[in-house]
């Protein structure tokens, strides 16, 4: 039987990593200073930086030598770690997918042509760094590939999303990225999601989060998708059956075909549902209530947006001599609970570290980053090292 790692397991892994930051000592480190040809450094060949097939090496040999190749590192704190999702910018005259709970190999996202919610373009970030999820995009099963274009930038920040716009879109506000997070984490490929969403006391987060889990919003249905309009129907109202209660819709028809279904009461407590058409004389209609994530939109944005990736911010500058700026690097990594140099079993907890040895030079010689230096140890033993940095003023190698 085949198996695969689910999206929810990946999200759990990202959550677990972030939650472990405060209980452990994690460090972002740089390594593998750029050598000069023809003296490639440890673990490299002379063309390591030019090969078109330059895939990273991941084996126990390299794992054992990270201490030899690392240059310096900086401690990772919870303030410098965020969950991220792929960046989908709102652009006028662009088509977007709507949120659906049932995208799969049997149900394709009509705009992005994918079969997974988290791979589809069902949310956007605006130029004001506000994030919205798309609840409706004007599509139906009658013509699922004809996705209207979004013409009006979402701006409403109410808990209850506004009615459908004339372009067919309906957007639900989730959050706004803070200016401090923009400075640290802004990216062309991803945008960050606020930390500690489930326990935050931030007024804006509390408003959206609690709105997704109130008596009114709890698993409330916001949208019913018309997969098939059928025939022989008349304008009417109908209830939404399932494991929730209180859901009702208003149905509009054209020549006997259902052409509009408006949720007049979303009810609460639904994890599945069907529109009750048993009292109707029509046939062939298929109406799909769209089930919200978790307890409602905005309650758990990590599941709602699929935050299975983590972005780490680490700034290395010349404010400390531990971070020389005249070097280069080809390795970026994360260390967990490194031990101090002098004590076995003692975890290093400082703010930054240097893995480099230093030598004072008393003679005038030409030294370049990447040069190989040797020392005869006697008995045929020769120690080798590579220059990571050289301070021409202090003569410290």
Features from the language model and the residues they span:
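Conserved, function-critical positions that sit in or immediately flank catalytic
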Residues: 167, 171-397
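Tryptophan-rich substrate-binding surfaces of secreted polymer-degrading and adhesive proteins
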Residues: 1-216, 286-290, 337-339, 382-384
């Amino acid at each position: 039987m085949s198996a695969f790692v689910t999206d929810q397991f990946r999200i759990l892994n990202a959550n677990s990593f972030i939650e472990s930051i405060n209980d452990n000592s994690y460090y972002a480190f740089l390594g593998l200073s750029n050598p000069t040809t023809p003296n490639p450094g440890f673990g490299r060949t002379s063309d390591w930086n030019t090969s078109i097939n330059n895939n990273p090496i991941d084996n126990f040999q390299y794992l054992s030598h990270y201490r030899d190749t690392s240059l310096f590192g900086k401690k990772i704190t919870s303030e410098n770690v965020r969950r991220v999702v792929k960046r989908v910018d709102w652009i006028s005259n662009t088509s977007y997918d709507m949120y659906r709970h049932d995208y799969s190999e049997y149900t394709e996202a009509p705009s992005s042509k994918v079969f997974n919610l988290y791979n589809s373009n069902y949310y956007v970030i605006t130029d004001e760094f506000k994030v919205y999820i798309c609840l409706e995009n004007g599509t139906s099963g009658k013509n699922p590939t004809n996705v209207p274009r979004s013409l009006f930038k979402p701006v409403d920040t109410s808990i209850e999303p506004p009615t459908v716009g004339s372009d067919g879109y309906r957007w639900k506000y989730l959050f706004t990225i803070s200016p401090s997070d923009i400075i640290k984490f802004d990216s062309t490929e991803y945008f960050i999601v606020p930390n500690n969403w489930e326990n935050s006391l931030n007024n804006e987060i509390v408003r959206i989060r609690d709105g997704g889990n109130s008596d009114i919003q709890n698993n409330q249905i916001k949208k019913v998708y018309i997969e098939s309009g059928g025939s022989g129907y008349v304008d009417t109202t109908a209830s939404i059956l399932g494991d929730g209660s209180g859901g009702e819709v208003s149905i509009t028809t054209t020549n006997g075909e259902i052409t509009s279904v408006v949720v007049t009461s979303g009810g609460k407590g639904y994890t599945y549902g069907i529109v009750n058409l048993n009292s109707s004389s029509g046939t062939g209609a298929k109406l799909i209530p769209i089930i919200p994530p978790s307890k409602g939109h905005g309650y758990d944005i990590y599941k709602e947006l699929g935050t299975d990736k983590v972005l780490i911010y680490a700034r290395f500058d010349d404010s400390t001599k531990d971070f020389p700026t005249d070097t280069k690097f080809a390795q970026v990594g994360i260390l967990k609970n490194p031990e101090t140099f002098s004590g076995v079993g003692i975890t290093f907890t400082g703010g930054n570290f240097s893995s480099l040895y230093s030598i004072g030079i008393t003679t005038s010689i030409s030294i370049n980053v990447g040069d190989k230096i040797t020392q005869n140890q006697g008995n045929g033993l020769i120690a080798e090292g590579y220059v990571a940095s050289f301070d021409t003023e202090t003569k410290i190698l």
